[in-house]
């Protein structure tokens, strides 16, 4: 009888712990004055040689506490560059239909750590930041 109770308790604990698993998104959010800028990969984990997107979400506080409003035309005077080691590539930024969301297609060619460098301004606020994004993994 005790063995049955232990097995049932173990199964219940396993089910509860599996239910608590959530996907982890390795997006990084930084604040620049009133703006929140989030950067990461569209498909995670990023894998070398597989087409992906560098994605951005740029918001400011909404009218109600705890809400945020997407910033349109944020890249009008803002440039994004992806950097790996000593190499860099300017990104062609596309607007997503959802306000405040942007993306740039890229095929990562090397495993390891990448940075996104943002330079310019958003509505008069100077932006000069580097945001680390999730490491690119190998195909094996």
Language-model segments: which ranges?
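Bacterial N-terminal signal peptides that target proteins for export
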Residues: 1-10
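C-terminal segment of classical bacterial N-terminal signal peptides
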Residues: 16-23
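N-terminal soluble domains immediately following signal/targeting peptides that reside
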Residues: 23-140
């Amino acid at each position: 009888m005790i063995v049955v109770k232990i097995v049932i308790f173990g199964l219940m604990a396993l089910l509860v712990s599996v239910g608590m698993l959530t996907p982890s998104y390795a997006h990084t959010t930084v604040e620049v004055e009133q703006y929140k800028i989030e950067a990461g990969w569209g498909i995670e984990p990023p894998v070398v040689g597989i087409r992906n997107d560098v994605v951005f979400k740029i918001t400011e506080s909404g009218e109600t506490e705890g809400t945020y409003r997407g910033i349109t035309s944020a890249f009008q005077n803002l440039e994004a560059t992806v950097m790996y080691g000593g190499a860099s590539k300017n990104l062609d930024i596309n607007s997503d239909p959802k306000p405040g969301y942007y993306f740039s297609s890229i095929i990562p060619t090397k495993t390891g750590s990448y940075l996104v460098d943002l330079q310019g301004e958003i509505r008069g606020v100077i932006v000069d930041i580097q945001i680390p994004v999730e490491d690119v993994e190998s195909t094996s």
